[in-house]
Swiss-Prot record:
Annotated function: Involved in postimplantation and gastrulation stages of development. Involved in the nucleocytoplasmic shuttling of STAU2. Binds to DNA and RNA.
GO molecular-function terms, A-Z: DNA binding; double-stranded RNA binding; single-stranded RNA binding; zinc ion binding
PANTHER family noted in UniProt: ZINC FINGER RNA-BINDING PROTEIN
Name of the featured protein: Zinc finger RNA-binding protein
Primary localization class, coarse: nucleus
Leader sequence segment: none
Self-association state and partner proteins as the record states: Found in a cytoplasmic RNP complex with STAU2. Interacts with STAU2. Does not interact with STAU1.
Residue ranges, compositional bias (Low complexity): 362-374, 427-447
UniProt crosslink position (Glycyl lysine isopeptide (Lys-Gly) (interchain with G-Cter in SUMO2)): 509, 541, 623
Amino acid sequence: MIPICPVVSFTYVPSRLGEDAKMATGNYFGFTHSGAAAAAAAAQYSQQPASGVAYSHPTTVASYTVHQAPVAAHTVTAAYAPAAATVAVARPAPVAVAAAATAAAYGGYPTAHTATDYGYTQRQQEAPPPPPPATTQNYQDSYSYVRSTAPAVAYDSKQYYQQPTATAAAVAAAAQPQPSVAETYYQTAPKAGYSQGATQYTQAQQTRQVTAIKPATPSPATTTFSIYPVSSTVQPVAAAATVVPSYTQSATYSTTAVTYSGTSYSGYEAAVYSAASSYYQQQQQQQKQAAAAAAAAAATAAWTGTTFTKKAPFQNKQLKPKQPPKPPQIHYCDVCKISCAGPQTYKEHLEGQKHKKKEAALKASQNASSSNNSTRGTQNQLRCELCDVSCTGADAYAAHIRGAKHQKVVKLHTKLGKPIPSTEPNVVSQATSSTAVSASKPTASPSSIAANNCTVNTSSIATSSMKGLTTTGNSSLNSTSNTKVSAVPTNMAAKKTSTPKINFVGGNKLQSTGNKTEDIKGTECVKSTPVTSAVQIPEVKQDTVSEPVTPASLAVLQSDVQPVGHDYVEEVRNDEGKVIRFHCKLCECSFNDPNAKEMHLKGRRHRLQYKKKVNPDLQVEVKPSIRARKIQEEKMRKQMQREEYWRRREEEERWRMEMRRYEEDMYWRRMEEEQHHWDDRRRMPDGGYPHGPPGPLGLLGVRPGMPPQPQGPAPLRRPDSSDDRYVMTKHATIYPTEEELQAVQKIVSITERALKLVSDSLSEHEKNKNKEGDDKKEGSKDRALKGVLRVGVLAKGLLLRGDRNVNLVLLCSEKPSKTLLSRIAENLPKQLAVISPEKYDIKCAVSEAAIILNSCVEPKMQVTITLTSPIIREENMREGDVTSGMVKDPPDVLDRQKCLDALAALRHAKWFQARANGLQSCVIIIRILRDLCQRVPTWSDFPSWAMELLVEKAISSASSPQSPGDALRRVFECISSGIILKGSPGLLDPCEKDPFDTLATMTDQQREDITSSAQFALRLLAFRQIHKVLGMDPLPQMSQRFNIHNNRKRRRDSDGVDGFEAEGKKDKKDYDNF
């Protein structure tokens, strides 16, 4: 005797391919089982593991027994494959069996095991099985030659399970394995599949054993099959692994009431009502199916090859199935009038905000109707009973009937088989009977939801629900409830609502249905309670209406908007003369709360209607819509993104400039190395190359073993191209910092604005003064101060790091005088205080014809404001007696030469911006030379304007754009040639009409010293010591790469050159290091 272990059994799991082959060889299936059918069947069960039917080795002596949870259930019979459990837990694996055309296959059970048995998780299927019978039969194939000692199974004598045609039964029977060589007894054993713990279902009622089955063809596989009765309903059962609903059989249909007990659901609440519906249907069908039991049992025995004989309780499974295809299960919500795709979606819908809001609105409607003893619609409202909505007029009702929502509800009700009310408009009346009907109709929805929802509930909830339904005392309530319950599936028979006979052991909480039932009870209690005083009515109404108030309505209520249109709100009274609601003629709406009335009169909708129909001058606030708010937020976000984009772009531009410089340095370094190589080739005594760069394409004379001549024209760069790196590095060190640039920009802009205010003040003063005199017209022609301009390094963009002095030129309409200078110096501090809170030190320098402005914060900047006038230069250029012109000057006129120099600075700045700013490398070289003039005393005597002219002429006269290194070398070459020496052509000033040498202020010694220094700098550049000219440390050379390059070339050249050539290369290396 091999005891049946309730916990787990060990099986050998072969591959699925071997299973199909063995089944096909041993005529296991009653029909041809092709590979395509197997694939289709395997695809039918998504939870199927890799292993197929559990097999035992033929040579194994020990007996293997498999207990598994059913995975797929057919309407014929449930053919299950045993799961393969090799260590501790058995995992289900369905046998892929093609079902008959008329038999709908159910989905598989995913495994969810406990420590001792198998559980069932939720499965989605087209038709639910009835609740499990008193026991389930467990068929076992074993190698033991004796009967197993498992306890027998007791079957209820009155419990019948339908089965479809014999063809479907044969398919299921064909899926069963043949017994072993020895006589194998198929016996029933209690299944622990519906239990969470180790407790099995026991039954103390009458016991019947299934007769032993004749021995058949030997099969080495040991399998266990559990046949679960399947009902032909379409109601799905969401069975979970940890739940066991407890069923109590009614005494009407069974001899003994058997109760299944187990642990409750922890997650799914959907199984109880479906099980209840199936159980009701099964009880109705049991009486009708007893007649065809014997014939169906005979057919089953014939198809299974007399494998085993079933007794009476199994004969009623052979009834014919429903011929039309079973429609898919539709989860319908009566409150929201929508359907859901599945139980999980329906459950999420019940927990959603939209459903809860409609549920609260339904509750409010019921409470209000119970309190007022009247409906809430307007006088002319037309009600659609199907959609449970009210329309304000015939046009609105006709539009609703034609609308998509109504048509969708009609289609759903047609599909569900529910009665569809007439589309004739139902005018809402104020009678008490209609109130009872309207109150009872939503009340029945929890019952229908309970039948449709597949939601687990407790027996107390069901009982309370029925109590709440009976308290109304309305006959139409029960009929509505019964109709909705029975009309869930189209092919489900009518059921008696004998709810107290079923004990529901389900989930811990049921939010939607429980709340609805409690709300119904509360509604009915309020309805049945007489109204003692009129004071209680507004309280109930206030509670009812205040729930759906939105924050926007509260904000409008709390605002300072005054209510308008009191005369257009009518009071609707009932037969007793009591105010039951208010009706607004403008908005065509009704409300039953005084607070809602005030809120409506202040609301934006009412005010818009009042403005449109009564008073167009009424100001209605523009409420930004969600779209407008989103557009504004999008604009702000895009603006921030744009600012961030430009900031990042500036940073990236700086980074690109640095990378470009680095790449250019790398490029010119490679070119320099190549150029050095060709220079060495030219220095060879027998090299065939002429002096200078390599010849054109295809030049002969390349010696064997030498690298080929570079193709194309000769590179334009000279050997000194590495100077660009030094020049750019030096330029980066002398360029002003960001803080210095910001400080310069700040003080210059503040000074310019302050001078503008000073000019306005002086102009006002002059106007007031001229109004008192006789020459008003003459004095009002020009302002005293015409404008301020930037000059010098500030206008040319030649600032260096550390420069603290910038120059401005203030143009005057008349010749500047000391009086005007003092007036400006006195008025400037007042205007500066208006513009900027910072303190500035202002000093009047009469000898310089300027005002000096110093900032008091770091970095301290100085602005020199020089006064001048174009009249001074015009008089100077005028032919005639100069003294006669000077007689007209005021006695305190400022220094004439200073004013002329300021005018010349204006011309120089204009010329520089037009000619030098756009020239490549010009500004960079001028900054380098300005730094050289500050560092080296010899160059300090070089006039800045002459240097700018020289650099511009040297770079612009080149045949091609010059790099910074080449431009610097070209400038030194020009100076070294003696262009600034006495007797040379010199540098004429292009901003003067008469010829004027810009080098006239330099002495001969200074000219010679600068020329000599330029020649020495040129020699340093030729010997790769430009860092000494620039006053910086040598930059780290890529000596490693350069040496590697030389070593590579030396290895190639050493094969075909003589010792002199190799010696020359060694000298070149030493020269480079030097």
